[in-house]
Amino acid sequence: MKQLTGAQIRQMFLDFFQEKGHAVEPSASLVPHEDPSLLWINSGVATLKKYFDGRVIPQNPRITNAQKSIRTNDIENVGKTARHHTFFEMLGNFSIGDYFKEEAITWAWEFLTSDKWIGFDKELLSVTIHPEDEEAFTIWNEKMGVPKERIIRLEENFWDIGEGPSGPNTEIFYDRGEAYGNDFSDPELYPGGENERYLEVWNLVFSQFNHNPDGSYTPLPKKNIDTGMGLERMTSIVQDVPTNFDTDLFMPMIGATETISGEKYRNGDLEKDMAFKVIADHIRTVTFAVGDGALPSNEGRGYVLRRLLRRAVRYSKKLNINRPFMFELVPVVGEVMKDFYPEVLEKKDFIAKVVKNEEERFHETLHDGEAILSEVIAKAKEEKTTVISGVDAFRLYDTYGFPIELTEEYAEEAGMTVDHEGFENEMEKQRERARAARQDVDSMQVQGGVLGEVKVASEFVGYGTVATESNVVALVKNGEYTDSLQVGEEGQLMLDVTPFYAESGGQIADRGCLLADGVKVLVKDVQKAPNGQNLHQVVVEEGTLTKDAAVKAIIDTKNRSSVVKNHTATHLLHQALKDVLGTHVNQAGSLVTSERLRFDFSHFGQVQADELEKIERIVNEKIWESIDVEISQKAIEEAKEMGAMALFGEKYGDVVRVVQVGDYSLELCGGCHVDNTASIGIFKIVAESGIGAGIRRIEAVTGKSAYELMNDQVGLLKEAAGKMKTNPKDILTRVDGLFAEVKQLQKENESLAAKLSNIEAGNLTDSVMTVDGVNVLAAKVNVADMNNLRTMMDDLKNKLESAVVVLASVNDDKVNILAGVTKDLISQGYHAGKLVKEVASRCGGGGGGRPDMAQAGGKNPAQVEEALAFVQEYVKSVSK
């Protein structure tokens, strides 16, 4: 058998079938774009459904591919077993009504056994078939020469997912030898059984029947072939390694994790081996998924990514990794996969940023959640129960963002379980509260009662008209029809023709008035009625308004002018965000008022100051270029072909309104806009913030509001300069001088603190105790921060030469703990990381680190003395 890399096997497979007249289908994105039923692309055939069901006729009925796939239904088994993965590659060859069994079997055998290709020993291959598939038996036995004792008939060799194409399948198994199993009394030791010796190499499915609604099977007029070979499993066989994780597809990530952690893979510790495997698997999945456009969040595929990253971080603690590190593995994945997936390396910086951002968020979550969970577990044990209540599990999830899966894993380690039913009950209560809140909001809208009965037409003409003659066609007061509204009364009305824009697409409604002889009506708001008409919220200021009255409808043009400036600016901002941050940016919400604009968008981390500056400059440059804004009606397909940006989740009709700003911005939009970007005047970003997982918000102003803001800022600058007795242009020099003075004072303060620390360290040596022949010092000290604590620790370790030292300090009701072990005692089994974790857990905290030095935090200062007392117990337990 040849020595081949995973990349060589993949390419060899595609080359083989290309020689057999197959077209190579590119590996599709993991995020399905044509199949809403799938969360992820999860098999090689998933992207080819359009061909198999006849919606699309392929140019070539013979297809081959190497398809990246994600499956997370067995996530808890990843790392525990030899071959479970969340990300894998499926190699396949497919026939859409062209060749069938004989060719599929013949080519599979040729690829596996020919010296030109894989070169397996034929004697080590066995096959399984369906008991009634005599055709497959004949091909295997008579044409391929496989002896009948190596052709196993199994009932489960039938591919059927309900109604639709189905048929028997044949699987090919490789015998890895007695080293992987030689107990022939084991009922599972056969090709197709649960064992490590006979591994499935390839599954060939023969779609030859149609499963009818009545349960019967009839022959398909066109028979299809669908085969699948897992690249990772095939590589483990070719490279003769015990698991998929030991192949060159995973070992570079495991090796990098060894370097980061200082731990060794396959060093006799099964728990650590599992951690290495989980990390290697999950970073592959996350790297590819983010590269294909998915981002961590709290729902859907985003939650899958968050769960995988957090599970990997959780396992990394078993390797004493207590910092963000997964992002460092992204370029390693890119290098491994670059031959077939060069885009991973191209996007590595972006992917690494996403991963690092998520890791940092989770480390904060872990710190708080672990401390609370430790208390919950301790409380449960005190109450003599082995079940963590659903209420506690929900509190961890809802308040601290601690995933239920992690709570379950921690509970399992402590020999406990989680009340899942109770947790789900709490989740349902939360959903009910959310539904009730939504109902409360809806009840405030003017979309109930008689309004649902109003079918009269109302035409909106406000894109090009600011005033129009109109008639009141419906008048409502307190949810009931009325014939009139008197002075001071409020109500709702519909006009047969209206220039008033109804709030939608983030743009607020127009304001204005209705005028008639002796009548003046203020229009306060406009919303969409249940049947789509513009519904005006009004108050009568003069006279009496009657149903069927003829009125002149006039919008507040000053207000509209400010609104349209801000709306067109959001379009420019959207494109500028994509230009600066990347094409992953998508609109997640907006608000356009006359005073300001607010734009929410998908992005993995805080937008940096220099990025904000670039974004702001781009928008202003487009304003100053005086670009015409063109608005047109297009067929939806034509608009998409033009590249128009559509809002995710928004439903559009067959004909859409396209807003185009020169050749810079192209969006589907029903709102109001300026005729030329010059009308916007100036654009100024006011704030940037995060409003949820993977969602950022920019607030900005334009025109007069931007001028007033900048004028205020100049005023503040002048005032600050006056207080510092300088002029505005020299203010930075003055600030730098003040900083230098402060820095010098800090330096003097630190020097004094170091001297005091050294004196205190000298005094502490008098408190050293000997426990079972080991010098032990556990003390509460007065220092300002962790840096001073480290300085004191170094002084003590140098003075004592051989000792176990634990120092704790309390500042602002927070506990800092530092443990240190000298080199000679590390070899005797003393471990600072394990010790500090135990000490911290006794004062409401958590932490860990290296054998020689480790830090932790706590939340209960009153328990510090009691926690430090444990140090002697620890030393005694290790010395036994």
Swiss-Prot record:
<keyword id="KW-0648">Protein biosynthesis</keyword>
<dbReference type="InterPro" id="IPR050058">
    <property type="entry name" value="Ala-tRNA_ligase"/>
</dbReference>
<dbReference type="InterPro" id="IPR003156">
    <property type="entry name" value="DHHA1_dom"/>
</dbReference>
<keyword id="KW-0694">RNA-binding</keyword>
<dbReference type="Pfam" id="PF01411">
    <property type="entry name" value="tRNA-synt_2c"/>
</dbReference>
<feature type="binding site">
    <location>
        <position position="669"/>
    </location>
    <ligand>
        <name>Zn(2+)</name>
    </ligand>
</feature>
<dbReference type="GO" id="GO:0140096">
    <property type="term" value="F:catalytic activity, acting on a protein"/>
</dbReference>
<keyword id="KW-0963">Cytoplasm</keyword>
<dbReference type="GO" id="GO:0005524">
    <property type="term" value="F:ATP binding"/>
</dbReference>
<dbReference type="GO" id="GO:0016740">
    <property type="term" value="F:transferase activity"/>
</dbReference>
<keyword id="KW-0067">ATP-binding</keyword>
<dbReference type="InterPro" id="IPR023033">
    <property type="entry name" value="Ala_tRNA_ligase_euk/bac"/>
</dbReference>
<dbReference type="GO" id="GO:0000049">
    <property type="term" value="F:tRNA binding"/>
</dbReference>
<dbReference type="GO" id="GO:0004813">
    <property type="term" value="F:alanine-tRNA ligase activity"/>
</dbReference>
<dbReference type="InterPro" id="IPR009000">
    <property type="entry name" value="Transl_B-barrel_sf"/>
</dbReference>
<feature type="binding site">
    <location>
        <position position="567"/>
    </location>
    <ligand>
        <name>Zn(2+)</name>
    </ligand>
</feature>
<feature type="binding site">
    <location>
        <position position="571"/>
    </location>
    <ligand>
        <name>Zn(2+)</name>
    </ligand>
</feature>
<dbReference type="InterPro" id="IPR018165">
    <property type="entry name" value="Ala-tRNA-synth_IIc_core"/>
</dbReference>
<keyword id="KW-0436">Ligase</keyword>
<comment type="function">
    <text>Catalyzes the attachment of alanine to tRNA(Ala) in a two-step reaction: alanine is first activated by ATP to form Ala-AMP and then transferred to the acceptor end of tRNA(Ala). Also edits incorrectly charged Ser-tRNA(Ala) and Gly-tRNA(Ala) via its editing domain.</text>
</comment>
<dbReference type="InterPro" id="IPR018163">
    <property type="entry name" value="Thr/Ala-tRNA-synth_IIc_edit"/>
</dbReference>
<comment type="similarity">
    <text>Belongs to the class-II aminoacyl-tRNA synthetase family.</text>
</comment>
<dbReference type="InterPro" id="IPR018162">
    <property type="entry name" value="Ala-tRNA-ligase_IIc_anticod-bd"/>
</dbReference>
<dbReference type="Pfam" id="PF07973">
    <property type="entry name" value="tRNA_SAD"/>
</dbReference>
<dbReference type="GO" id="GO:0006419">
    <property type="term" value="P:alanyl-tRNA aminoacylation"/>
</dbReference>
<dbReference type="InterPro" id="IPR045864">
    <property type="entry name" value="aa-tRNA-synth_II/BPL/LPL"/>
</dbReference>
<dbReference type="InterPro" id="IPR002318">
    <property type="entry name" value="Ala-tRNA-lgiase_IIc"/>
</dbReference>
<keyword id="KW-0547">Nucleotide-binding</keyword>
<dbReference type="Pfam" id="PF02272">
    <property type="entry name" value="DHHA1"/>
</dbReference>
<keyword id="KW-0862">Zinc</keyword>
<protein>
    <recommendedName>
        <fullName>Alanine--tRNA ligase</fullName>
        <ecNumber>6.1.1.7</ecNumber>
    </recommendedName>
</protein>
<feature type="binding site">
    <location>
        <position position="673"/>
    </location>
    <ligand>
        <name>Zn(2+)</name>
    </ligand>
</feature>
<dbReference type="InterPro" id="IPR018164">
    <property type="entry name" value="Ala-tRNA-synth_IIc_N"/>
</dbReference>
<keyword id="KW-0820">tRNA-binding</keyword>
<dbReference type="InterPro" id="IPR012947">
    <property type="entry name" value="tRNA_SAD"/>
</dbReference>
<dbReference type="GO" id="GO:0008270">
    <property type="term" value="F:zinc ion binding"/>
</dbReference>
<keyword id="KW-0030">Aminoacyl-tRNA synthetase</keyword>
<keyword id="KW-0479">Metal-binding</keyword>
<dbReference type="GO" id="GO:0002161">
    <property type="term" value="F:aminoacyl-tRNA deacylase activity"/>
</dbReference>
<dbReference type="GO" id="GO:0005829">
    <property type="term" value="C:cytosol"/>
</dbReference>
